[in-house]
UniProtKB/Swiss-Prot annotation:
Coiled coil segments of this chain: none
UniProt-recorded name of the protein: UPF0260 protein YPO2083/y2228/YP_1926
HAMAP family: UPF0260
InterPro entries registered for this protein in UniProt: Puta_zinc/iron-chelating_dom, UCP006173
Family per record: Belongs to the UPF0260 family.
């Protein structure tokens, strides 16, 4: 009998760096800019993607240098993950952290990102490049029902 996959055996804190990185499905949702109301701290979701995001592949074009190139790039870590209530319910970090399994379309289960793109989980069908946007308020999305 084969061993269950690592995400069913370990907590996020117990995962190796490579296991942690492999959980990311590459949907690009983390790379969409959010606006925060300074008075209420409410988060507004936009379809404005960081210029480092390759919208077609939903991959960072400069992953190794992303933090030096984009000062607002957010690094999800085991330590700060609990502060990111805005992560979508499809996010593997959120799912595993809440004790759930990976969705059937996740690349670790399917071997590719095709199913994820087919389910329209990725941002490639809605994202626009940050450098092409004049007024970000024109790009605010309806607040997802799962967003806190």
């Amino acid at each position: 009998m084969s061993q269950p996959p690592f995400w069913q055996q370990k907590t996020l804190a117990e995962m190796s760096d490579s296991e942690w990185e492999s959980l990311c499905d590459g949907c690009g949702q983390c790379c969409l800019n959010k606006l925060i109301d300074e008075d209420t701290d409410e988060i507004y979701f936009t379809n404005v993607a960081c210029d480092q995001l390759n919208i077609k592949t939903c991959q960072c074009s400069n992953y190794e240098r992303r933090f030096e190139l984009e000062e607002d790039c957010i690094k999800l870590t085991r330590e700060n993950l609990v502060t990111f209530a805005w992560l979508p319910p499809t996010c593997a970090y959120r799912l595993i952290g809440e004790g759930h399994d990976l969705p059937r379309w996740h690349p670790l289960l399917t071997g590719s990102k095709a199913a994820m793109h087919g389910e329209r989980i990725s941002v490639r069908h809605i994202a626009v490049r940050e450098s092409e946007v004049v007024d970000w308020q024109d790009h605010i999305l309806n607040k997802p029902s799962w967003a806190k």
